[in-house]
Swiss-Prot record:
Gene: pgi
Gene3D superfamilies noted in UniProt: 1.10.1390.10, Glucose-6-phosphate isomerase like protein, domain 1
PROSITE patterns registered for this protein in UniProt: P_GLUCOSE_ISOMERASE_1 (PS00765), P_GLUCOSE_ISOMERASE_2 (PS00174), P_GLUCOSE_ISOMERASE_3 (PS51463)
Alphabetized Pfam families for the sequence: PGI
Protein name per UniProt: Glucose-6-phosphate isomerase
EC annotation from Swiss-Prot or TrEMBL: 5.3.1.9
Species in which this protein is naturally found: Salmonella newport (strain SL254)
HAMAP family per the UniProt record, alphabetical: G6P_isomerase (MF_00473)
Entry keyword set: Cytoplasm, Gluconeogenesis, Glycolysis, Isomerase
Amino acid sequence: MKNINPTQTSAWQALQKHYDEMKDVTIAELFANDSDRFAKFSATFDDLMLVDFSKNRITEETLAKLQDLAKETDLAGAIKSMFSGEKINRTEDRAVLHVALRNRSNTPIIVDGKDVMPEVNAVLEKMKTFSQAIISGQWKGYTGKAITDVVNIGIGGSDLGPFMVTEALRPYKNHLTMHFVSNVDGTHIAEVLKKVNPETTLFLVASKTFTTQETMTNAHSARDWFLKTAGDEKHVAKHFAALSTNAKAVGEFGIDTANMFEFWDWVGGRYSLWSAIGLSIILSVGFDNFVELLSGAHAMDKHFSTTPAEKNLPILLALIGIWYNNFFGAETEAILPYDQYMHRFAAYFQQGNMESNGKYVDRNGNAVDYQTGPIIWGEPGTNGQHAFYQLIHQGTKMVPCDFIAPAITHNPLSDHHQKLLSNFFAQTEALAFGKSREVVEQEYRDQGKDPAQLEHVVPFKVFEGNRPTNSILLREITPFSLGALIALYEHKIFTQGAILNIFTFDQWGVELGKQLANRILPELGDDKAISSHDSSTNGLINRYKAWRA
């Protein structure tokens, strides 16, 4: 990957001038001037997904200039570098190959002179065999009963991805009940343990090193709880499995290393649901559906790596995001799925985007003088409409939004889905076109009211519009289409990081707090007053000690 400051390119300078021409142009004007706008600014993927980006403050000239930026920063070279196994995570000297985990073509992918695909396929086969034994009831707990509940213990990528996918694919789930524990707050594990039976529960401990503080604290608490009933430590092997690479620590915990599922340094945590970390997904929806999830992602990988940039969906969405973040000053993006099963999707890509591109140092080690990753947030529709859409419609901040919905619901209950989708379509129309003062006044006349007598209310009912959105309409949310959608967002994030000259696949920002917590933890072991920190931290610790005494 080349290290090119995007602001030093001629394309960036051209975009700055273009912004000066575009900043006062409205979406309404763009539609009024082009009856073919939807056709020009939308695209489909495999007849499974329609991406409509026409309700954005862009023209064909805007996209051409953004594509020039991608060319000048050598995005094409960056894509080739990732897919070929080059160590593009330079701060950790690692390749970035989550695409290998879903490489259904089995084309060799080489890291350090070695094809990784045989190992990937071997772990998949091992997961298949294990999951089939659990799901079928062939695997028995220590009292001879089949497993009924699975508790995934992890944090970050070892939790957010599997939790999001198992929720999104709940219509495909089997008889096993899934639980997810992540927070080191004892309340999280305590509440889950109240719901399960030690005789019929399987714990998955997801930690590559088997040293992650939160995960191992929860795992040891789960083990202690289990042994209070089971008694004999040899029974741990029937109720615990590990998603890890530390065989020694796994064995010492009491887990049979035959039930340890490995993954590799070239798998980043927030891109790991495709790996052994996805075992909870397999146990929830079955191996065949997991393969469909992989296949959908692989199809998007092929689209991303082979489709010209002008028609490449992840690239188009990434470029539009850069346009708003760096030229319009938009600091956030909202992800708004109109599907209740997708209620964790925004939270998942909150980590995916903010941990990847929340960087202020470029690939040369210099502080940047431009915007990098946006703040990501969102909730399912229509809940959000009754919570934060007010600010999106009439606030002072630009919030570009992605609206996501399936055309076909898994629950065709009465006219629920038509009502849901009517809101999905209405919101992007309202955000784009708004409501003028003239329309508000005419509405009052139509009601037999005199607008002049309601002058004190009229301004508050005006919507400026011109709020940008993308609409992603899926035929249906299936394992395949979900895999493709997740990969679409992954590659959007990669594209933005590549163009913005930052390292997308490390996360040093999580380290400092961990280090300080490890220093503070021993200080909490007694009731002595602390004076080793700043006055604020000292004051907080000392009040905590006084109150707990």
